[in-house]
Amino acid sequence: MKTLNRRDFPGAQYPERIIQFGEGNFLRAFVDWQIDLLNEHTDLNSGVVVVRPIETSFPPSLSTQDGLYTTIIRGLNEKGEAVSDARLIRSVNREISVYSEYDEFLKLAHNPEMRFVFSNTTEAGISYHAGDKFDDAPAVSYPAKLTRLLFERFSHFNGALDKGWIIIPCELIDYNGDALRELVLRYAQEWALPEAFIQWLDQANSFCSTLVDRIVTGYPRDEVAKLEEELGYHDGFLDTAEHFYLFVIQGPKSLATELRLDKYPLNVLIVDDIKPYKERKVAILNGAHTALVPVAFQAGLDTVGEAMNDAEICAFVEKAIYEEIIPVLDLPRDELESFASAVTGRFRNPYIKHQLLSIALNGMTKFRTRILPQLLAGQKANGTLPARLTFALAALIAFYRGERNGETYPVQDDAHWLERYQQLWSQHRDRVIGTQELVAIVLAEKDHWEQDLTQVPGLVEQVANDLDVILEKGMREAVRPLC
């Protein structure tokens, strides 16, 4: 069986206009996949050079396949049908290592056609590393490497204003573009680079903050033989991902034209502020996950897919989203509903086995950041507590007993909560404290909740009532009236 390369698999090749820091699965099934579609359907005509930003020889370089690889996008489409779509990606030309090919790396800045910089260097990538110097070959941190590359560009083109870059980081931190820009400016000042360079950074370059959303499941180790048989070739860089994707970019309106999104619309939004989209994702996608997990798991289910195929649990989650989360969010209702509909479809994806216990990690913090804001906003708006979000809190407290149908399961959270719950549930079993007292102790933890939740009218009582029903009748019976 042949391995992918451009000699045996000839096809389009595009001039290099994009630098990408990061060789991982996410960017390949997200950014490079979108660039490939735009190259095929428009005159974007842009090839990608992947820069490996860390010193490692694993995985091997994408250049061993001349930049070619296959994405397999699978899940439920807009009509709810299971689809699996294989695509040979031709947008990447080559990969270089900033460690072993430093001169080649700097040379990227000399190419007048270069226009975009994308990156995903993990959440820890956009950070300051003390001791990074201008003359390091290379510096340790990504922002320092980028500063050096930008200075190379500035110098080579004598500060020409039409030679700046559009820089689009995809790292999962808030306002990633602003964070990256601040670090580049910090290095520029620390290295005493000329004032003209700092002005050029501001005038000629755009640092765009983003929100990225797609579950990328990566190399399908268990199915490789079958998939390669279907494809008819060997591909060491196969990359799988879900059908859904969303790319929100906070940047100039002209970006839509520059990326040719006006000619071939993708699910890419160019917006003035990513904040409401971030809130929407946290509240609906992450919030639904967090509400679902303790309820579904204690109802005897193990994966998100099983939960969504269970009529009662699915109804509980959908009602929580549409009746209790969406009404308190600050975006047009139709936008929120179409996003929610995509979310429930993603949860049903038959190709992804998402274990409930793995999502349960750090559930106390997740509840505070993802559900509590909507619970409190609903109480404020209506004068009554949202029934399902409140029930989810009771289910979460019950979950920390660590026992289902007489069998124990691992609970993962910080040591404080694990010890606290062990003590509280032990006292509850020994009848030293009652349910209401247990709930009050949990809700009074100001350090965790950042407020005293026992002061929210009726919250202790309602959570305690729900918890009592869960303990007496089991989760199935307890949740039924809310389905």
From Swiss-Prot:
A cellular-component GO term for this protein: cytosol
Protein's GO biological process: D-galacturonate catabolic process; mannitol catabolic process
Reaction catalysed by this enzyme: D-altronate + NAD(+) = keto-D-tagaturonate + NADH + H(+)
Pathway terms, separated by semicolons: Carbohydrate metabolism; pentose and glucuronate interconversion
The UniProt record lists the keyword Ion transport: no
Residues annotated for NAD(+) binding in this entry: I18, I19, Q20, F21, G22, E23, G24, N25, F26, L27, R28, A29
InterPro entries in the record: 6-PGluconate_DH-like_C_sf, 6PGD_dom2, Altronate_OxRdtase, Mannitol_DH_C, Mannitol_DH_N, NAD(P)-bd_dom_sf
Keyword Cell division recorded: no
Superkingdom to which the source organism belongs: Bacteria
EC number: 1.1.1.58
Cross-referenced NCBIfam families: PRK03643.1 (NF002969)
Family: Belongs to the mannitol dehydrogenase family. UxaB subfamily.
UniProt-recorded name of the protein: Altronate oxidoreductase
